[in-house]
A protein has these predicted regions:
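Extracytoplasmic soluble-region selector
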Residues: 156, 228-318
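Small side chains
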Residues: 107, 114-115, 165, 237, ...
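Structural signature of tandem-repeat unit edges
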Residues: 1-41, 46-71, 79-94, 102-115, ...
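Non-catalytic beta-sheet/beta-sandwich ligand-binding modules that flank or precede catalytic cores
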Residues: 208
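Hydrophobic structural packing positions in well-ordered secondary structure
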Residues: 43, 121, 211-212, 274
Length: 318
């Protein structure tokens, strides 16, 4: 069977069976059908908000999913595609659909998509290029398991969690973790990680390694206390206005609320990011030390890497 045709009066199809036809190349729908429409041989809902079926033997190498698509039905619609090489997903999906066991070589995931779902690209053994734009928040378990041709991937800022075995049995040897990730679940020990220092290494009873964000609070004369970074509910400046002399330095200090309770002491800056509005007036280091370069004013923004919470300090250089 190479073609499947939906007549005008048909309002329901056995989609699970339809998506199991290995030889299917094209789907056609009568123009006056009330439930479905087809475009380039692909089956959608009448309003084109749902993708129902992409023929497994469709000869096209490139598929740009229409931006109108908000949902891909879980009837193996994009699984085990034989000829598709380049896939661009709709920006209006909430998560990536299942595309496992397909011939895909390149996939583009728009930043509006919240996450890469569990096993989405499992066993896509020709997949060698993954483009992810900023906005992705999570990658679930085994998302790229057995993608042996995948040798590198750039993870975007804003990513918060990486699940179990996401990059197991891929070609990835090194991986840079952005400074927004809160947790990396069990990861292949053979992968060399370049990660933020606030991600601490832990071992499960099984011996599996995982990483989790920790926030350290230091108070004068007391032992430093460490909390899960996910418990931070607010950060604020010790002082919101600073005046320094040209050529002099001072260090910004951050107060922190854990589970809505203000703690004594100051937050270790390793989990913070510092930026200045005027680099010619004020220089700021990764540890929060500011230096007055010339007379003027600047605003230093302090951001909690894991959630994006911020506060601002107004700096005047005399």
């Amino acid at each position: 069977l190479s073609k499947n045709i939906a007549p005008a009066k048909e309002t329901h199809r056995d989609l699970e069976v339809l998506n199991e036809i290995e030889t299917l190349e094209e789907i056609r729908v009568a123009k006056d059908n009330l439930s479905y429409q087809a475009q380039d041989g692909v089956l959608y809902s009448k309003d084109k908000k749902q993708l129902f079926s992409y023929p497994k033997s469709k000869k096209s190498e490139t598929y740009n999913m229409p931006a109108s698509v908000k949902k891909v039905e879980e009837f193996n619609a994009l699984i085990n595609l034989k000829y598709l090489k380049n896939l661009t997903l709709s920006k209006n999906l909430s998560v990536t659909p299942s595309c496992n066991d397909s011939s895909i070589e390149s996939v583009t995931i728009p930043g509006q998509i919240g996450g890469i779902d569990e096993s989405s690209f499992e066993n896509c053994n020709k997949l060698n290029k993954v483009t992810i734009t900023k906005g992705l928040r999570f990658i679930n378990d085994y998302a790229f398991f057995e993608c042996k041709a995948l040798k590198e991937i750039k993870l975007p800022e804003g990513l918060q969690s990486i699940g179990v075995g996401v990059f197991y049995r891929t070609g990835i040897k090194q991986l840079t973790i952005p400074g927004s990730v809160v947790k990396i679940d069990v990861i292949d020990k053979s992968i060399k990680l370049s990660k933020p220092s606030y991600l601490k290494k832990f071992k499960r009873d099984s011996g599996a390694i995982y990483y989790e964000a920790r926030a350290t609070i230091k108070a004068s004369g007391k032992k430093a206390v460490t909390y899960k970074a996910s418990r931070i509910t607010k950060i604020k400046a010790k002082t919101s206005k600073v005046t320094i002399q040209k050529g002099k330095t001072t260090k910004l200090q951050t107060r922190v609320y854990i589970s809505k309770k203000l703690k004594k002491g100051y937050l270790d800056p390793e989990i913070l990011k510092f930026t200045t509005s005027n680099k010619k007036v004020v220089k700021v280091s990764s540890k929060g030390t500011i230096k007055g370069l010339k007379k003027g004013k600047a605003t230093v923004t302090v951001k909690l890497r894991t959630t994006g919470k911020t506060y601002k300090v107004n700096v005047k250089v005399k």
